[in-house]
Amino acid sequence: MKKYWIWLPVALALSGPLLAKDWHVSPKGDDANSGATPAQPFRTLQKAESVVQPGDTVLLGGGIYASAPDADKSHNSALLKVRTSGRADAWITWKARKGEKPELHSRQWSAIEINGSYHVFDGITVTGQNDEVVLLKAIEASKKTVKDAFYNTNGIFIEGRNNPPESKPHHIIVRNCVVSKMPGGGIVAIEADYVTVEDNKVFENAWFMEYGGSGITFLNNWAFDDKPGYHIVVQRNMSWNNKTMVAWEKIGKLSDGNGILLDVSDQDEGGATNPNADASVTQGATNPNGDPVVKQEKKEARPKRPIWRNRALIANNLSAFNGGSGIHTFRTSHVDIINNTTYWNGAVVGYEELFPNRSNDIVILNNIIVPRPGGKVTSNNRNTRITWDYNVYPVDQTIWKGPNDIVADPKFIDPYRDLLRADFRLAKGSVALGSGGGSLPQAVDLAGRKRPTGKGRDRGAYEQ
């Protein structure tokens, strides 16, 4: 008996990992199945969410997972709504079954909405209905009191606003996903912490929403703790042709449609941009153009966010042909923007390529920044503690000048509009080859290639 009680705590401690399960889902499955084997898959992702436990893996079989015709389309509805949380030692993983391509088609407010913590989403394709939308009808819908999810569907949405302050979503990884053609935002995180968005392709999103969305957006980061290290990581993503074509209802004109945006981590309650129209704003600047608010909404008392002291990394991304900026921060602090390539952004709303706006402690190094014809490299509006150096841009500018900047054509191999076909690697003889700085070194480039490969580091998203 004595030996039994010695070993029982050990058995209990190991029971979590040992009992972790694989759950199987397929569009050809049945929610009455056990879900325990590939031969007995569930049909819906929501059924899997109802049984998943910390440490479990949900394996998505190939095919299309679509919203049912009678699906709930009220605010905060989603094809998959993730409320369950994993643990620090037992994350929950949602991933494509090896060799298969699961694709989500949602007509609700999001394809995936994540309210829980400790989740990994890996290798999932989310495709929206942009090809079906008529712009005039989207504009008409934006003027109605009752909002229609069809014109505002987000892709992958980490949503913390409805969680109590002590349980905001945190420790979320979105990787190897393809998010495209969403009428709303592509990958969005609001009131969350410890979020990594990496190795994704995000394109043709935010076209028809009325809330000023973008390809990849973080808004109102909510600190889980103040431990050192990066809390927000956006790396090795391709983000292109995200834009807005319907006026943002708060200002009555087009706004945002950026490739990558880190938005509002300060404590000021006024002037927040908002990809989903819930955060109230006050009169004042709401975007890089300084457009005033023309529509006010009643504001409910909300808990005050913890002061954001943590650091974010935006690195090795390619952001091109977006209607807003390639990359920018707005009312945000403590961000490292390293080894990115931006190209021909801002054609819809006129934003600059890459810039901080009303931000503090932003480090911008080793980037290649190529504005569209007539466009601008960067701007400076009420910023403090900006570090800018080792950047390459083809047209001179006087906003920020690093001693190691180079003004020259970086010589891309093939800067085609479809990034699935383009080649933004550097041609032989490029001034960006081997001339980068060594501060904040990145281990790999956009393609996963080791940095550096030679004597010096390359600038931009690719190492050669």
Regions found by a protein language model. Give the residues of each.
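Predominantly extracellular beta-rich ligand-binding scaffolds that present long acidic/polar faces
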Residues: 71-79, 89, 288, 310-423
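Acidic Gly/Asp/Thr-rich repetitive segments characteristic of extracellular carbohydrate-active
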Residues: 27-62, 66-67, 79, 109, ...
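Surface beta-loop-beta hairpin patches that serve as ligand-binding interfaces in beta-rich domains
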Residues: 421-423, 430-464
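Right-handed parallel beta-helix
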Residues: 66-68, 73-80, 107-231, 235-236, ...
